[in-house]
Every structure is written in structure tokens, then in C-alpha cells.
Amino acid sequence: MHQDTVRATAFAMPLTSPAYPVGPYRFRNREYLIITYRTDPKKLRSLVPEPLELSEPLVKFEFIRMPDSTGFGNYTESGQVIPVTFRGRKGSYTHCMFLNDHPPIAGGRELWGFPKKLATPTLRTETDTLVGTLDYGPVRVATATMGYKHEAADLSAVRSSLAEPNFLLKIIPHVDGTPRICELVEYHLEDVDLRGAWAGPASLNLWSHALAPVAELPVLEVVSAMHIVADLTLALGKVVHDYLPKSEPRDLKGRSHAFAE
């Protein structure tokens, strides 16, 4: 294969059969269970990268069911999202995500910088209760419950929240283990068709796990819960802050990730 062909066809790996297709990435009947809770402010500050800023010690634990997504298929994900501000604009920073489908893991990490790991989240309705669970291997690390459609939510407020910017810390290493890319990425949800949104009573329990440390942001108080169903497009992102300025060498001196023999 000629190198011009490589350049012309390069999108994702493997070159001849990428793990995920070119977008746009449209999601239909995307269902959210979002529980907002109060946590330890000192611990939260230690996990949110500058120049993002915190206003309140809040975390949103999300379970998202995606039965119909372009190129990514039918899957579920879960994770922690932190309300932040960036240059005076309110938004959300994605701290961690866990899902059960390889294409959105690969695409999410490589394109946007989503902090995705392989795990087993679920979101389902059990009689009168919306139930979200997250297992890492055989170990349960999160369980959420919410009364099913107890109260209609303010749709205009929900639309406004879905329109806010979202932020990711994208990290791609160089072949020697030093950071090749270390950027703050902003992305938005577009063409949102909000099908419904509801509030209700909720609970959230987290358990410690070495590789899925969601419990390091403990639940001190459940503040609110939201159940949302929408169609939307996940737009591509843009870089809003570079942690490795162009004036600095990308192979940072004094730092090594050489493998031990």
C-alpha cells in the first residue's frame, strides 16, 4: 500500500477495518438516569483539572441506556460527571465512564478523549422503579434507584442543561510513554429532540474498587434525580486548552515510562 493511500484512508485502527465508523453519531431513544449528589469538596477539588473551576461540591452519577446509536450499536454506560465552570461558562466535566461495548470505548477515547473503561452497567425498569447498576467484573460498585415517572420535569430547564458545554481531559501517549496529546476538549450535544423528562425520589450506593474508584467521591446527600429520554447527535469536539504548549518539547525531560525488564 502506497503511503499516499495510507494518509488518504487513515481514520482509526485497524487501517483497513476501523473499530468504529466515521460520524455523525446519532442516538435514538437515549435514556438517562442522573442522580446529583453532594460529596467531599476537598476530594472533588483534587480530581478536577485546572483551568476548570468548581462552584459547588456536586457530582452527577449517570446511567445511560443507548439502544440505537449510529455505528456504536446497542449498549449501556455509567459514570461520574462533575458540574464545573470554564471561563465563566457553566458546563460538565466527565470524570470517569464505564461501558459494555468496544466501538464507543475506542472511538470515545481516540476522538474526544472520553475516560472510558470496559465494565457492565445496566439501566432497566423493575415494576415501579428505575434501577441502574454498575459491575466491574463480578464486583458491584454502584446501585441507583428512582421512582418511575413520579413527577414531570421542567422541559425547558432540561433542554438548557443538555445544551451546556461538556469538557474532557484527552490524553494520548507518545510511543515512548511521554504525553503526545494532553488537552482539554469541549463538545456539545446537537439536534436534541427531548421526548420526556421526570423527577422523583432516588437513592445511590457506591462501593470501593481498586480499578473503578467511584466511591472516592462519597455520597453525602442525594440532591436530585432526573430520568430523561431524548434523541440527539454527539458532535465532534474542539480543543480549548493545551497542557503541552507548542513551545515545550513533547518528550518532557526527566520523565520516563520505560517498561521494567
Swiss-Prot record:
The active site is at K116. It comes from the Bacteria. GO terms for molecular function: acetoacetate decarboxylase activity. The keyword Lyase applies. Pfam families: ADC. It catalyses: acetoacetate + H(+) = acetone + CO2. Gene3D superfamilies: Acetoacetate decarboxylase-like. Keywords: Decarboxylase, Lyase, Schiff base. The keyword Lyase applies. This is Acetoacetate decarboxylase 2. It comes from Mesorhizobium japonicum (strain LMG 29417 / CECT 9101 / MAFF 303099) (Mesorhizobium loti (strain MAFF 303099)). The gene is adc2.
